[in-house]
Amino acid sequence: MSTVNVQIGLHELLNGSNAQIQLSVPQLVEKVLMRNEGKLTSTGAVSASTGKYTGRSPKDKFIVKEASVADKIAWGAVNQPISEEHFNKLYTKVLEYLKEKEELFVFKGFAGADRNYRLPIQVINEYAWHNLFVHQLFIRPTEEELTTHESGFTIVSAPNFKADPAVDGTNSEAFIMVSFEKRIVLIGGTEYAGEMKKSIFSIMNFLLPEQDILSMHCSANVGEEGDVALFFGLSGTGKTTLSADPNRKLIGDDEHGWSDNGVFNIEGGCYAKCVNLSHEKEPQIFDAITFGSVLENVIINDQTRIADYNDTTLTENTRAAYPMHAIDNIVLPSVAGHPNTIIFLTADASGVLPPISKLSKEQAMYHFLSGYTSKLAGTERGVTSPQATFSTCFGSPFLPLDASRYAEMLGEKIEKHDAKVFLVNTGWTGGEYGVGKRMNLGYTRAMIQAALNGELAKTETAKHDIFGLEVPLHVPGVPDEVLMPEQTWADKAAYKAKAIELANEFKANFKKFDSVSEDIINLGGPIA
């Protein structure tokens, strides 16, 4: 199937009598309720269930192996190849399936808040609530922009279309396929809305580096003086909590690009976890869940329609999707200058990493590539005790290119813009998980504040004898003994043994990076 034929098929779909294009939020909410796709909550949000797929399905994600990208993609478990033949046949079947639907919902918008680098996108949805989701998550066009909008990538989403693995070359009934040549994302068999968001992020992680822009899985905020901070971290490290600062404006909570102009948000909304959400803990998120917002897999009281954020009957991965303008303390458009401070967050359950360390460029690249944190019991099936986990660049499921490409770009930008990088451990202190305790949030906030306002640039440091990290000896508002992890352990020999054990896990993980320069290994990693 040629690209021309793909466009003809899309044109027919978009011009069919069943295509509802660019409906407003109230219109989409009406459609969701009329079609029994969801319920209205007491705050005016739409609540929907995603069926058996309550999270991303990484084993069902494919990139079409096409001549123009075959030697660029880092093929493997994350980027699984599928043939053009399989894609073309499945794409044709999905289009025929959607043509028969009574209604289809189409959103046209953008990914990328910087107008110089934004990607025009369109999304064709079988479900009205999915279309409401993308309307809130991506960047919405003005009336004028809509008249000249030409899509650079199209998502075709048909959750009720099930693949046949024996015929379609998939691993299950679900599929998420990206064709870079045909500029199509094809999604079926799963109702989880996050697949649409993360597909566009994966695409931007391919397209932006080609323009010398670093794409990043991080949150970002900016201070009153225009100083920009990035927060990288895997689930459970405190990224959302620590980047939501009343004294700083939010640029974005999850996906960003770093160009020669500065930092920009890739999205136009937020996709926040809402397990155990309360107004006391996360007032910004709690208050954003109003009319037009989408709740995913949250249990709602049948009579009062009040959301119970503590009920994880369906999944712990309950989510809320809302536009950026639902939050008060934001920058719009979501662009800012070059980062002054970069924070890598890790929740170290072994309790051996310092609560804050200053990183050299090589150490920053090493820890960026490592993407370390601890998986805690309850976050995944089968995890009963904490396990060291490494997610390359703090976002390995979304990286189509070789990881070293992103790390090299980060190193270049750190050097060019003199960004200060810190590794912050929000995990355990005084012993490992089960013995020690979780790092005091007030102390972590004080350390981050000191990093942001430049106080740590002039403070005295000591080199950690196992990890080689520069550890500040004094931080305002934090007891000195907390800063050196060994001092918080009663059994110093046990500390050393545990630290060496973690250092060896870092080294073992890093062996997979065979294209990384020796400097990063020798100057960036553990020294014992």
UniProtKB/Swiss-Prot annotation:
Binding annotation for Mn(2+): 198, 217, 254
Protein name according to UniProt: Phosphoenolpyruvate carboxykinase (ATP)
Cellular component aspect of the GO annotation: cytosol
Binding site for substrate: 56, 192, 198, 319
Name of one Pfam family that matches: PEPCK_ATP
This protein's UniProt keywords: ATP-binding, Cytoplasm, Decarboxylase, Gluconeogenesis, Lyase, Manganese, Metal-binding, Nucleotide-binding
Broad enzyme group: lyase
Alphabetical list of PANTHER family matching this protein: PHOSPHOENOLPYRUVATE CARBOXYKINASE (ATP), PHOSPHOENOLPYRUVATE CARBOXYKINASE ATP
Cofactor binding annotation: Binds 1 Mn(2+) ion per subunit.
One term of GO molecular function: ATP binding
Chief location: cytoplasm
CDD domains xrefs: PEPCK_ATP
Family designation: Belongs to the phosphoenolpyruvate carboxykinase (ATP) family.
Signal sequence range: none
This protein's record includes keyword Ribonucleoprotein: no
Compartment(s) of residence: Cytoplasm
Cofactor(s) it depends on: Mn(2+)
Domain of life: Bacteria
Name of the encoding gene: pckA
Pathway named in the protein's UniProt entry: Carbohydrate biosynthesis; gluconeogenesis
Function in brief: Involved in the gluconeogenesis. Catalyzes the conversion of oxaloacetate (OAA) to phosphoenolpyruvate (PEP) through direct phosphoryl transfer between the nucleoside triphosphate and OAA.
EC number, as in UniProt: 4.1.1.49
GO biological process terms held by the UniProt record: gluconeogenesis
Residues at which ATP binds: 198, 217, 233-241, 282, 319, 444
Reactions that this protein is recorded to catalyse: oxaloacetate + ATP = phosphoenolpyruvate + ADP + CO2
